[in-house]
């Protein structure tokens, strides 16, 4: 796939598209402008679509990704030294706001591998989680722990693969990420026609998901119980949770949520307590822990004004008997309660303090 340079003729408008004497406004039609702004190609299946509708459309309304790339030659000329495979071209991405993308010029067979993905190697402890890391891929060890990250955010480390955008849904995905050895490759998961944008995301199979080992026998069990576990309600949630963890198969609707969840399996703990240096995999867990040092109790009961450092403590308190309306059936068969003791307020305060202390020891639910 690799080895050729972006052809020079792709950087200028074809003479057939611009008649002598026409102004630039007459060449860049409303259709071209609409495609540039909203990333919608009129001809997503190549020249065949234009041939079928040649009696309805003019050459200005049926164009390919290559023609559009030529129309915005000023943008592409900055990348004239970028090494591109002969089978692809760089043009405006079909995803709004994502800049340039990579499109196929010819048919690309299913199973075609592209790569390796290049960039600087970053250790897990040196990753800045506050930055946008969308040009970064994980490389895993055989035991599923993160070995390092490959970061292509710096221009001197970028290759043509950097401009391949992430798919937003299963329907538009045509590439998947695979790990071969300690290198990252993109693999075509279907036959890709000309003038289609290459869009990548994680593969559904745990065998191709960055080389993470799967759970032995899990795939066979899933096939066996496929019809038993199917529920119509679950199918509606499928598209929203298409990004699945290959360890526990939980679905997520964003790449950042999936990465955050993966720290549970990889034991990566980037969040450090400034008081005791204890490490946590989730920022929310760290916030709850820090409150034990600071004494902060932001969760307050509106009935008795008792305060708690964690939401779980408040919810446990609200479920206690004094927050429930008395049951008539229970009152009819229950013995009479003794009269309130003089020290009842002190005992109630002690009970509330004990409940708060117990809440501190409740195991945190990590999702």
From Swiss-Prot:
Transcriptional regulator necessary for the development of nociceptive neurons, playing a key role in determining the nociceptive lineage from neural crest cell progenitors. Initiates neurogenesis and activates downstream pro-neuronal transcription factors, such as NEUROD1, BRN3A, and ISL1, specifically within nociceptive neurons, while repressing non-nociceptor cell fates. Essential for the proper function of nociceptors in adults, influencing both their excitability and their gene expression, thereby impacting how these neurons respond to various pain stimuli. The lineage of its organism: Eukaryota, Metazoa, Chordata, Craniata, Vertebrata. One of its GO terms (biological process) is protein methylation. It is found in: Nucleus. Interacts with EHMT2. Not found in adult tissues except in dorsal root ganglia. Changing residue 160 to C: In HSAN8; no effect on nuclear localization; no effect on its interaction with EHMT2. GO terms for molecular function: DNA binding; histone chaperone activity; histone methyltransferase binding; methyltransferase activity; zinc ion binding. It comes from Homo sapiens (Human). InterPro entries: PRDM12_PR/SET, SET_dom, SET_dom_sf, Zinc_finger, Znf_C2H2_sf, Znf_C2H2_type, Znf_PRDM12. Residues 318-337 are annotated as: Disordered. Residues 86-203 form the SET domain. The gene is PRDM12. This is PR domain zinc finger protein 12.
């Amino acid at each position: 796939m690799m080895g050729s340079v972006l052809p020079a003729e792709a950087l200028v408008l074809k003479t057939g598209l611009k008649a002598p004497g026409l102004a630039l406004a007459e060449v860049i039609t409303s259709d071209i402008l609409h495609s540039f702004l909203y990333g919608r190609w009129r001809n997503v299946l190549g020249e065949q679509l234009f041939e079928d509708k040649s009696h309805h459309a003019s050459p200005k309304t049926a164009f390919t990704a290559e023609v559009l790339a030529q129309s915005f030659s000023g943008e592409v000329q900055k990348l004239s030294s970028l090494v591109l495979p002969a089978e692809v071209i760089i043009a405006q991405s079909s995803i709004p706001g994502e800049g340039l993308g990579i499109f196929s010029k010819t048919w690309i067979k299913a199973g075609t591998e592209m790569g390796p993905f290049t960039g600087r190697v970053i250790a897990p402890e040196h990753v800045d989680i506050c930055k946008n890391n969308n040009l970064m891929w994980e490389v895993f060890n055989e035991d599923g722990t993160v070995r390092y990250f490959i970061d292509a955010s710096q221009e001197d480390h970028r290759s043509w693969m950097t401009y391949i955008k992430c798919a937003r849904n299963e329907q538009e995905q045509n590439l998947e990420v695979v790990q071969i050895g300690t290198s990252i490759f993109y693999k075509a998961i279907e036959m890709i026609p000309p003038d289609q944008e290459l869009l990548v995301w994680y593969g559904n199979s745990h065998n191709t998901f960055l080389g993470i080992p799967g759970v032995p026998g899990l795939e066979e069990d899933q096939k066996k119980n496929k019809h038993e576990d199917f529920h119509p309600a679950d199918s509606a949630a499928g598209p929203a949770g298409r990004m699945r963890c290959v360890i526990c198969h939980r679905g997520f609707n964003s790449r950042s949520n999936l990465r955050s969840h993966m720290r549970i399996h990889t034991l990566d703990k980037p969040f450090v307590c400034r008081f005791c240096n204890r490490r946590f995999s989730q920022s929310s867990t760290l916030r709850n822990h820090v409150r034990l040092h600071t004494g902060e109790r932001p969760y307050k009961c509106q009935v008795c004004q008792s305060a708690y450092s964690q939401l779980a403590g408040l919810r446990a308190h609200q479920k206690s008997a004094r927050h429930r309306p008395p049951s008539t059936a229970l009152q009819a068969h229950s013995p009479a309660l003794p009269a309130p003791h003089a020290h009842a307020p002190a005992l109630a305060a002690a009970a509330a303090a004990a409940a708060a202390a117990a809440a501190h020891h409740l195991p945190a639910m990590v999702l």
